[in-house]
Each structure stands twice: as C-alpha cells, then as structure tokens.
C-alpha cells in the first residue's frame, strides 16, 4: 500500500484545526454560553 505524502497529512491537520475552531466559535456565539454575552449597543444610552 502506498504511503501518503507529509503535505497531505499537514493539510488534513490544518483543516481539522480550522473546522474545530469554527465549530467552537459558532458554539460560543449561538449555544448556551451566548446567554452571558452583552450587547454594547443596548448598554449605551444616548
């Protein structure tokens, strides 16, 4: 069986990290932790 190139392994690793960070960001923005976020526009009165 052929061995995969190191570049393919690095690319898959980088993609996995990017997808993980994207998923974590979406979870923070829209999941249960989002209840603790403040809206600075609502806090500021003109």
UniProtKB/Swiss-Prot annotation:
Q: Give any Gene Ontology cellular component.
A: plasma membrane-derived thylakoid membrane
| Cross-referenced InterPro entries | PSII_PsbN
Query: TM spans, by residue?
Result: 7-27
Topology versus the membrane, per the UniProt entry? Single-pass membrane protein
Which superkingdom heads the taxonomic lineage of this protein's source? Bacteria
Task: Please classify the protein's predominant subcellular localization into one broad category.
Answer: membrane
Q: What is the name listed in the Swiss-Prot or TrEMBL entry for this protein?
A: Protein PsbN
Look up and give the organism this protein is from.
Synechococcus sp. (strain CC9605)
